[in-house]
Amino acid sequence: MRSSPRSVRVFKHVEPLTIGAQLHRHLRGAIIRGEFRPGQALSESEISKQYATSRQPVREAFIKLAEERLVAILPQRGTFVVKISVADVLDARFVREAIEVAVVQEAATSATPSAVKDLRDLIAQQKAVAHGRAEDFLALDEEFHRTIALSVRRAHAWRVIEGIKAQMDRIRYLSLDDATPLSVLIDQHTRIVDSIEARDPVAAANALRAHLHEIIVSLPNIAAQFPDLFESE
């Protein structure tokens, strides 16, 4: 199945993102959301037409996606969306936990009252969308974790997390209808913020670990439910 043009999307030729970086971000999101399915071929020429750009930015985007193990570039055959690797998901979760635990412990010792308020505001927004589209909740979940990192000036740490968590995000989108109830995730977020506000780094680390453990619980069921989307391991 080849990628097919939808509406033409024109990327702006402006800084700070290059056209290739903008295209990478968009294609990455489409793969994570399942708009491009594992095994699907991505046509360089069709994508360049679809996004009204030359082929060079498409090649740049494909190379970056290959580095993230979201696509495979096969000489003489083409570029294909890779299947999900359970090992990659677990490895990404391991690395993310190691980084984010350190970040949340730092937040529990130095986050400002303003940062805590920002986090509680995000939790309030999560509650407001909990009975709506799950995609809206996932966006707020992402912003919650990003805000913790930025509250202690760990923007680079968050960029590292963003770079390795794509495989985890693919699972999250597959499990929208069969995942941990959003109310549970909101309670977990609340415990994280409570621990940060209480200046308790041990409790904050434990709360974050429990939160990131959810994917380990749901992963076997998701792999069994969608076997054609996963690598045989």
Model regions and ranges:
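Short helix-capping and inter-helix turn/linker motifs at the boundaries of alpha-helical repeat units
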Residues: 18, 117, 180-183
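Short, flexible turn/loop "capping" segments at secondary-structure junctions
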Residues: 40, 73-74, 141, 184-186
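Conserved amphipathic alpha-helical segments that form helical-bundle/coiled-coil interaction surfaces
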Residues: 109-174, 186-195, 203-213
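Mobile beta-alpha loop/short-helix "lid" or hinge segments that flank ligand
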Residues: 67-72, 164-166, 180-183
